[in-house]
A protein has these predicted regions:
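Structural preference for solvent-exposed beta-strand-turn elements
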Residues: 1-383
Length: 383
């Protein structure tokens, strides 16, 4: 027979808001319909003035610590999603947890809830956190993940394309993703634990994005990785720890797609370009391209065909090089441009069929930033 609790009755007092926040963060990794019913559980452990909450789905784990008044230590496993719903609506400042006869009682003000305990002995152990690799401030990391994740593929049959490759080279981290039609690369500086740091990982993009969204942006992000056991990546931030299983596979060789010299350059107000693309693409059929005609310091955006609805808009630009016409998937354009944080976008072009590079630029007459590079393959179009 499985044991429902490791220890005797648990008695805890905890701040309701802190508890609700911790439960919500921890249970976000619990699947709505887990393959193994035990993975629907939230593990709660009380000891030494701390309440530890954890959840796991074999791909990603979450572990959270909050302060609590622990009268009696204990460990329980309860339905995580139900606990999250309950804690969202707790009416009083403090909440009391106690266990008796395989029941967890939650009391807050005049509200009382009881939950059946799940067999804690059946719950899998969380992965062991790898050794510390380095750290970076949270806003920098979050922005880099948001930019790099633009080009992750949704094709589950090619797992490597759903991932973000993270390359750690001394004080520089480079994140790259591609779905074969576009490529996103973000680069940032960080503080490595050791001066001679060299590691490459491939982590599922959607998981990395979910982890990054949960960070406290006032605290640093510690990244954990062990070359001897290169199957797991860990993240620590503000008392919260997440791990993610890595993708087993070889990321495509994409470095050759970036070229040093482009013959055609154009600098455009980023938000004005996004707004114009949204307007012009209203007449475009599904998956139809939007044309970008660069001519005489002007950019003409057009969509539609002669026998269909049409739209056109002209923007003033700063251009250097020969006239050129390229066409793109408007959604891919908007997603790439939206990831740029600078007010101007610098487009670099070679021909109408070769990938176009997009970079952010702080000033219209300044230099482009290489912290984020977005490559987009043009679509073929009819004149």
């Amino acid at each position: 027979m499985q044991t429902l609790q490791k220890r005797g009755s648990m008695k805890v007092e905890v701040n309701s808001a802190s508890f609700a926040d911790a439960v919500a963060w921890t249970t976000r990794v619990i699947d709505t319909r887990p393959a193994n019913p035990i993975l629907a559980g939230l593990k709660i452990e009380a000891s030494n003035g701390t309440l530890q909450l954890s959840a796991f789905n074999y791909q990603i784990s979450s572990l959270n610590h909050i302060e609590a008044g622990v009268d009696e230590e204990g460990s329980v496993l309860v339905l995580g999603k139900l606990m999250a719903e309950i804690t969202k609506s707790l009416p009083a400042e403090n909440t009391y947890l106690s266990t008796e006869n395989n029941i967890l009682t939650i009391t807050s003000g005049k509200s009382t809830f009881t939950l059946q305990l799940m067999p804690i002995g059946e719950y899998p152990d969380l992965p062991t956190l790898p050794s510390k690799l380095g750290q970076v401030d949270a806003p920098t990391f979050i922005q880099a993940v948001n930019q790099a994740s633009v080009s992750i593929s949704r094709e589950e049959n090619r797992p490597v394309l759903t991932g973000i490759r993270m390359q750690f080279e001394d004080d520089t981290v480079t994140m790259t993703s591609t779905d074969r039609f576009r490529l996103s690369r973000s680069t940032f500086k960080w503080t490595p634990e050791n001066n001679d740091t060299h590691a490459t990982t491939l982590v599922r993009g959607s998981l990395l994005r979910d982890i990054a969204r949960s960070f406290d942006d006032h605290q640093n992000v510690v990244i954990d990785f062990n070359d001897e056991e290169p199957t797991l990546l860990g993240f620590e931030n503000s008392g919260r720890t997440s791990t993610s299983q890595l993708i087993d596979g070889e990321f495509p060789s994409v470095d050759r797609l970036f070229i040093d010299e482009y013959p055609i350059h154009a600098v455009i107000n980023r938000q004005a370009l996004i707004n114009a693309i949204k307007r012009v693409s209203l007449v475009a059929e599904r998956n139809a391209p939007i044309r970008m005609i660069f001519n005489n310091q002007e950019l003409t955006l057009s969509a539609g065909a002669a026998d269909e609805s049409q739209a056109k808009e002209v923007l003033d630009i700063d251009m250097d090089g020969e006239d050129i016409t390229v066409a793109f998937n408007p959604l891919y354009l908007i997603e790439g441009l939206s990831a740029i944080t600078e007010p101007f976008v610098h487009m670099k072009m070679a021909t109408a069929v070769k990938p176009v590079e997009f970079n952010g630029q702080q000033e219209a007459d300044g230099d482009e930033s290489m912290n984020y590079r977005y490559l987009l393959v043009p679509m073929r179009f009819n004149n």
